[in-house]
Regions:
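Active-site-proximal cap/loop segments of hydrolase catalytic domains
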Residues: 1-144
Length: 144
């Protein structure tokens, strides 16, 4: 099998959104296109039951939280990154996306952003169809 290394894309939701954004900003010369849905951007804003289970508290592990934050990596973005969130997401609150967007603005990088008004962490029904069409179209537009 052949992989065109000039046209690699990555997609994920929630932790997968974190990984997508992390890959796009850690390996900006490897990944051309990414779609990050409901991405965790800074673990100090995520649910304590999950983050603190693995990382302890932000107060007791400030270095770990700082190292895993995607905010400082916003300056590294080169490819096309679509960030998507549900505006009523109680799991990965929109603050994650908005803070990353602010960091990108300050760094002069240009991600794309799409919001589903009134939607929670996972899309259902017509919104889910729209979401998957949007993701597919993004890869069609930027990986061909």
């Amino acid at each position: 099998p052949y992989v065109d290394s000039t046209r690699l894309g990555v997609h994920g939701w929630s932790f997968g959104g974190f990984m997508t954004t992390n890959l796009m900003t850690t390996y900006p010369d490897v990944f051309k296109v990414g779609v990050a849905g409901g991405p965790v951007v800074d673990w100090k804003w995520y649910e304590a039951m999950y983050g603190e289970r693995y990382m302890d508290t932000p107060q007791s592990n400030p270095e770990g939280y700082a190292e895993s934050s995607l905010m400082p990596k916003a300056k590294n973005l080169k490819g096309k990154l679509q960030i998507i969130t549900g505006m009523n997401d109680p799991v990965v609150v929109p603050q994650h996306c908005l803070s990353f967007l602010k960091a990108c603005i300050e760094a002069g990088t240009q991600p794309d952003f799409f919001v589903y008004p009134g939607e929670p962490h996972n899309m259902r029904g017509h919104q889910s169809v729209h979401l998957h069409e949007r993701i597919t179209q993004y890869f069609e537009d930027y990986l061909k």
